[in-house]
C-alpha cells in the first residue's frame, strides 16, 4: 500500500514509459498498457490525466493518432519541434499523428 501523497506503482511505471518514448515518436494509451502488461487504455489515460503534466504527455495519444482534447495547440508545438510525423488535414492544421510512421513499440525500436 502506498503512503499518502506517494505516486501509485502503476502510475509511476506509466510515467517512466512515457518519459522513455523518444522525441518524434508516440505510443497509444493501449500501447503503454500492453508494454507494461498491466491495465488498459483507460487506466493509462487516467494516470496521464492525474499525473502526466510533468511527463512528456504529448507522446501518448489515442490509437487513431488524434490529439488530446484541450491540448491540441501545445501538442502540435511539441510535435513540430520534435519532428513527429503528422497526417495532413484538408481543414487546416494537422489533426492527427501519423501512427504508422510515429508509433514506438518500446526499447530498441
Feature names for model-found ranges:
Residues 1-109:
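Nucleic acid-binding interface residues in structured DNA/RNA-binding domains
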Amino acid at each position: 500500500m502506498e503512503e499518502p501523497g506517494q505516486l501509485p506503482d502503476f502510475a509511476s511505471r506509466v510515467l517512466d514509459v512515457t518519459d522513455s518514448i523518444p522525441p518524434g515518436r508516440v505510443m497509444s494509451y493501449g500501447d503503454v498498457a500492453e508494454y507494461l502488461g498491466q491495465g488498459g487504455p483507460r487506466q493509462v489515460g487516467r494516470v496521464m490525466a492525474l499525473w502526466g503534466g510533468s511527463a512528456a504527455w504529448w507522446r501518448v495519444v489515442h490509437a487513431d493518432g488524434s490529439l488530446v482534447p484541450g491540448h491540441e495547440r501545445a501538442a502540435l508545438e511539441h510535435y513540430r519541434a520534435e519532428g513527429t510525423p503528422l497526417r495532413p488535414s484538408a481543414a487546416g492544421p494537422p489533426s492527427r499523428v501519423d501512427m504508422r510512421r510515429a508509433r514506438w513499440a518500446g526499447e530498441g525500436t
